[in-house]
């Protein structure tokens, strides 16, 4: 699914006629049809982000989504999720946003998770406002805890 979405964003095609490839294409098309209409601008695809001296990762997209600068990530799942079940995804969005802010001097306002199941059930989770700021704070606390534990175990 991720490969199809990445190729779509880059204006390229991808053909995989295996059963898994056909399913991945259907899932990607669901995300494109239901999640991409609100994508107004793409800054980058498969963007490697890092917070100097602390961590690194790669997000699927950075851009403007529903009028806000956003970190956008695609997720495939076997069954639909409730918002309270995706805490780790929300923290991941916050981590990417903090890294983007630090390196590029931005103020990413929003995390967007576009999710699809194998039977093409689409879900969109948007984290912004105070909730997004809170997740940024929670992620920084986790980083502090990690480095404190690492220091104590040395």
What are these regions (language model features)?
Residues 43-150:
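Mg2+/Mn2+-dependent nuclease catalytic core
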Residues 152-154:
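Acidic, carboxylate-rich catalytic segments that either coordinate divalent cations
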Residues 1-56:
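Metal-dependent nuclease catalytic cores that hydrolyze phosphodiester bonds in DNA/RNA
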